[in-house]
Amino acid sequence: MNKVKYEHLLASVLKPARYINNELNSFGKTPSDNCVNFCLAFPDVYEIGFSHLGIKILYTILNNEEDAVADRVYAPWPDFGKLLLEEDIPLFGIESSIACSNFDVIGFTLQSELTFTNILYMLELAKIPLLNTKRNEDDPIILGGGPAGANPMPLSIFFDAFLIGDGEDA
């Protein structure tokens, strides 16, 4: 899996620290063909999503498994999203810099209906077909879960499956 080259864009955005892996306690496991590669997606900016307890729990559980790797991705601010589109650079995991489209599974946290449009924006930036009927076996499985997923119908044409209840128990 090749890393996305995006560093040249950082000087052009308001808060570049949103897009680099500069956190304490991150696992730093590298996605590979020998394990299931998860990208945990939070459809809001880094400053909102990094403190979300549910993502932290799933991230820790998955990375403690021998045969799994979990990375994270957050919705970019419009300045960075625009540059990604202009430069034809796909949205990527914050730790590995691997394109989201190269992961096996992308799991979106559905905290509020207000972030549903951000999910579609993130799929577009990741160069993943929006409609589940347009995706094939080379595309990641798109999962959703969280409080706003209690009624999955509004997003059912975009997701492959939903987890109802606590993700760590699924």
What is the predicted function of each stretch?
Residues 1-16, 65:
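Helix-enriched interaction subdomains in cytosolic or periplasmic regions
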Residues 2, 22-27, 60:
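ER/secretory pathway lumenal C-terminal domains and tails of membrane proteins involved
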Residues 2-8, 46, 123, 140-142:
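N-proximal accessory regions
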Residues 23-33, 96-98:
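Short boundary motifs at domain starts and secondary-structure transition points
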Residues 33-35, 139:
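Sequence-level motif detector for i,i+2 pairs with an aromatic at +2
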Residues 38-43, 49-60, 64-84, 88, ...:
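Low-complexity, highly charged intrinsically disordered N-terminal segments
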Residues 45-48, 113-115:
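Short acidic, S/G/P-rich loop/turn micro-motifs used as interaction or catalytic elements
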Residues 75-170:
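Glycine-rich beta-alpha loop elements in corrinoid/cobalamin-binding modules
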